[in-house]
Amino acid sequence: MKLLLKNAQIVNVFTDRLETANVLIDDEKIIGVGGYDDSDADKVRDLSGKIICPGFIDGHIHIESTMLTPSELAKVCLPCGTTAIVADPHEIANVCGLSGIAYMLEASENLPLSVYIMLPSCVPSTGFDETGAVLEAENLAVLYKHPRVLGLGEMMNYPGVLAEDPQVMQKISEAHEFGKLVNGHAPLLGGKGLDKYIAAGISDDHECSTAKEAMERISKGQHIMIREGTAAKNLEALLPLFDEPWSRRCMLVTDDRHPADLINEGHIDNIIRRAVKAGKPPLTAIRMATLQAAEYFGMKGVGAVAPGYTADLLVLDDLKTVKVCDVYCRGQLAVSDGKVIDFKKPEIRSDIRKTVRNSFYLDELSPSDFHIEPEGGRCRVIKIRPGQLLTDEWITEINFDRDNGVDTQRDILKLAVIERQLNTGHKGIGFISGIGLKKGAIASSVSHDAHNLIVIGTNDDDMAIAANRIRTMGGGNAVVSEGKIIAEMPLPEAGLMSDLPAAEVASQNEAVRVAVHKLGASAEIEPFMNMAFLSLPVIPLLKMTTLGLVDVDSQRLVPLFEK
């Protein structure tokens, strides 16, 4: 059946112009843009001057970080105008291995939202991570033939690239042999090190926190993903990239974003809105969110309103608010007047579901498990940078005579990362600054990328209660104060995702967020999202794993106590 969308203003992403035209669609494809009339179609819709633009593409997202299953994420993203995402399932792969990747492929099959996959490159991220699985190059090879697999996901182990680690280089070369892209992840890397990283065949990065850093990469041929997530907020710093000549090498991504933020603020549409509000050209922002992402990833016939292109289209009220009225996915109406039209949820094989549902293996913990035996007074403390995933090393005097080193007046709290997938009993314990808790404890099974149990608290008793609640729930988030659980959020899918509708997940997420802030958490941070990255030993500078503190730049374990 042919559909005519007439009397529309078309966003031409090839020319950065707004043009008056009609759009003729046949099945999944656009077959004409121009002076078509009612006689050319079986069905006609008069848009009365509204705007048609291509569907938005999120070029880098971890579905697991939304805490939603793929079908629930689709219900949230589609009304925001997102018709395609490029997902790296390295969160669930670290927990469940190949079964985790299979889960993501099956759970996203035939959704109105097109879900493409980048295969996880670093499972584990480095040798300092203890994960539920290890994926080598030979494990990934068979998956490159899947039609929705576009390449190798973010190569976080940039020290391995610089050292020419054989396994790392094999993964990169194998992706290239299949004609696939390799995503980058190398925060703060510059100069000769960056040259070597790019020369290895890594063609993009989403970790830039300054315009200068991004411009160096663009000038050396990389594509830049401008990220605005829940914890990592780089849009403001990277606004100069919306200008020429930089914009032609950029796309828009969220990376990690919580459901409440998706529902309340939006997705890629939110990034476009904020860029426009900051004075950047709306057509440039839309091009970055559509055609440039599609062309970079090799999505043929996607990302434009033009003959031969897939009819992934948005109907907008205007370019200032980017308010999405309707969404067409592959020629079918998926969102009408802001409401998602029901679609069938994909089926997942029972063996895959069983693996994902049983990922927590850990003995009960006691307060003594969080005790630190003093070996001196000067300690390394991880210091959070608000609005960033980067952390600093703070060496300071710790008074162990009171509260075993915790000092809420100086914002020094305890941090523990405990292995939860193989029951090794390994744990790293130290101190964290920048969270701001005045009492209580918080715990989560979401701790990038190994997703072991992570706990922050003001006292050992509450830390043990919070940790054990995560254990009994089979994963999730918990907030404890004065011996009582005051908020919790179960995440039974690999300890990473909920099985509830998006609105309920957002409500639970907001409840734990509010509870943490009532305990004194800093208003400058998103506590659970920031906490989740404190164990990722590939983002500078100091991180905590189950093996202890890691100096990311030197890729070595460092002692808690500074002798």
Where are the model-predicted features located?
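Active-site mouth loops of central-metabolism enzymes
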Residues: 58-69, 124-136, 203
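Divalent-metal coordination cores built from histidine and acidic residues
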Residues: 74-179, 245, 486-490
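Short acidic, glycine/serine/threonine-rich loops at helix termini
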Residues: 96-100, 126-132, 163-167, 193-197, ...
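Histidine/acidic residue-rich metal-binding segments in metalloenzymes
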Residues: 134-154, 160-225, 232-253, 263-284
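Active-site microenvironment of metallo-dependent hydrolases
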Residues: 1-21, 25-29, 36, 78-80, ...
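Short, ordered loop/turn segments at secondary-structure junctions
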Residues: 89-92, 120-122, 157, 187-188, ...
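Residue-level marker for buried hydrophobic side chains located in beta-strands
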Residues: 4, 55-57, 117, 252, ...
